[in-house]
Amino acid sequence: MQGTKLLKRITADPAIFGGKPIVRGMRISVELVLSLLAQGETTEDILHDYPDLEADDIRACLAYAHAVIADDTLEAVRVS
């Protein structure tokens, strides 16, 4: 699925999570999905734990994160 189509899966509604980006209007935030991936969860694990999600939703979260930071210059982040 192309990036533009994937990004249509990400929505923002001020009534849900204060307008944070969410997946297809559900109460599953992009932030949650990215956090789970960063913690080492696999796509299969996430789909098992959140059966309303589809594999393209997870790819959409990654595409959204890429779109957000694509033109940014990032500074080193220190993790303690």
Q: Model-predicted segments: where are they?
A:
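N-terminal first-folded block
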Residues: M1-I28
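Short alpha-helical elements of helix-turn-helix
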Residues: E31
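A short, basic/aromatic helix-end/turn motif that makes direct DNA contacts
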Residues: D49-L53
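C-terminal structural segments of small proteins and small subunits
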Residues: A55-R78
